[in-house]
Structure formats: structure tokens, C-alpha cells
């Protein structure tokens, strides 16, 4: 995974690379998505593997960052072999962050290329990094009441499997998520809001019911006077595992991982979010024992890791200007 960002313009991108290719699935639940190469991840379509997933800010402009990843991979001979050269398959999704920094600052192919150059297997940074630098949450009452979102990660070990040499290896399921939700973020144990629509003067959260239809966004800081001004949201992420999955299995895991969002984001999958989760399988660990017949075990692990990654993205985020973070309102 690698990050690149514009710390003045407050936008960035995060890439997850699979140089040897990874079986991929995707599930788009929000109604305002910005995505790239998602159709080919459907089980009925030809291409079996992708080589990277690019998560970016910049709204639809940010999809250009994936072209930088394509350039980086092509230079290294990585991609789908056509007989006339390789075509790297790079999926992607974007968040809307044009409202927090400069609306003219957008992830482009140069930033996407830099994220690939920065990629490593070291423990990843979280919070205000990569695609998470411009993320915000809690925009139910307008942007002026938003709090800082961010990028979070988590992983779990799910038993053991066999590698290509029949040696036992741990089966790992990890999550990367960029939390930029319309809704509030809640503690899954207590149900209390930890980040969301916040009255900075009264120093309290504005709503625990999250009923979007009750609010006049013009009164609360949006110039549009309706929830049409809230299309700038979206939580996007990737589940990555070494468990051997088919395209059908990867799509099922991506689908189940959305339950992790639903546990901690209230509301989620709205008309004003473009919530999208990808699932990648490197296939380095063949599932054995009980796991061999139960893809749902991988899906449940994906749900748990996504839930924790969302909370970590919020708790590791730092406030920007007048936008507070979770630690400052506790």
C-alpha cells in the first residue's frame, strides 16, 4: 500500500497493489458512487485478476490517479497480456473532498504514480494520510458541523491454510477504508456517537437519531437549502486476503464487508453516499478444514476488520482548522 497527498490542497490518494495479480470482487451500495473498472470484477466477465486498486479524493477528477498506477505498472511489465503489450487492470473509487481544501486541488496521474512509488509492506500510516487527508464525517446538518474523517486499517488472522508447497501459512484478512460519510460514526459497543454532526459552539453532537429529512441544510451551513448539497460523501475501502477465493467468493466477501460499515456508520449507504468496497485475493493460502467449505468465515472476518478500520480511521484523524477530530470532543 502506498499514499500520496497534497497537504495544502487537502486531497490525496492511496493505492493497494497486487503485482502478481489478485482475484477481485466489488460491492457498490451507496447511490452516489464514483468508480472505475468495477464491471469487469463481476463473475461473468472475462478478466480474472486486477493489479491495483486506487482510492482517491477529488470526486470524479480523482479517478485520473488510477492512470498513474497504470503507467507505473506498465513500466514494470505488469498487466493483462493482450499479445500487443500489457494492460494493467486498476480498479478505483473516489470520495468528494473538494469542500475542505482547494477545489482545484485534485489527485492526478502524477500523484497516483507517486503513491505507487511510495508503496511498501510496512505497517501503514492512518488518519490524515493518502485518500483520507480530506475526509470528513457527520454532514447531516451541513458541512459547518462536520468532523474530521480519515483512513483506517486493521487485519486479523483466520486460522491456517496451505501455500503452493503445501506448507501451512496463516490466513490473513485485512481492511483499508477511507471514512468520508454523511452519517455519524458510533461506538459499536455503546452506541454512542464518537464523531459526527457537531455543534462547535454548544460543544455537543446535534443528533443521535440521524433523520436526514428533518434538517434544513441552508440553515445549517449549506448554500443549497436542501440535502442535495450533501452529495459530497462516501466511504470506500478494500478487503485484502491471502485466502484463495474465486471471483464469486471475492464478490461475496465484498458484500459482507459492508456489514462492517453498517455497524458503525449511521446512516450508511444513503442517496448521498457512494459507499464502495473492493475485495482482493492473492490466493497464496488455500483454505483447509472448516474454512474450505465456508466462505462466510472469510466474509465475517472482513466485516470485523472493516468495522475496526472505520473506528481507527476516525480515532487516528487530526483536526484541520475549525474542523474538530474525535479526540478533541471527548
Language-model regions, residue ranges each:
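Alpha/propeptide regions of enzymes that mature by internal proteolysis
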Residues: 1-330
